[in-house]
Amino acid sequence: MGVQRCQGPILPWSQRPSQGCFRHGEGVRAWLGACEGALQTHPAGREPLPIGALHVGQVAVYHKFVVERLGRVAFGTELTFGSFMAGRAVDTFEGIQLGREENGFGGVCIRTAGDADGFALHKPGQIRLIRVKNKFSAMFFDAFLTFGFHEFVSTLGDKEAVRVPVDRLYGPVLERSASVLFVEESSPL
């Protein structure tokens, strides 16, 4: 799959929110509280956060369930694109790549394989549906992949398009069974 790891802390599986937490929200709120505290420990918000973190952008949808935005923190769920199997991701996720303007896409592409028969292409602020194993997952990406593309995440497709801004990324990100925390920078009301 060709996923590379960045340096950063990993939250043990036993401490990660479960699917039920996503549905009910309380576990997510409690877990995000610790992450928000980690953000506040550094004036620039660059202190490494559990699992993987971006300091710009947000993603907050899993199987049509929208995780509530809490202040300047929004949580990106397990990237499974299917059903959970013993708490692990289904082997359909292959990677992420940037859509290129010359192809008519300006956003983010989530690549899947196996029985998956779709992928998502997003322009900032838009929502698209992905058909995977006859299920639909909605993923919302704001404009966070905007600069610093200098590390490959997947070996798929055009290698010039499969990079992420690792200068703002911590932890193993976008691999099977990985969770990703997308953190918004504070902005005036």
Curated annotation (Swiss-Prot):
Domain of life: Viruses
InterPro entries given in the database record: DUF5441
Pfam families assigned: DUF5441
Keyword vocabulary terms for this entry: Early protein
Protein name as it appears in the record: Uncharacterized 20.6 kDa early protein
Organism field: Human adenovirus B serotype 7 (HAdV-7)
Record lineage: Viruses, Varidnaviria, Bamfordvirae, Preplasmiviricota, Tectiliviricetes
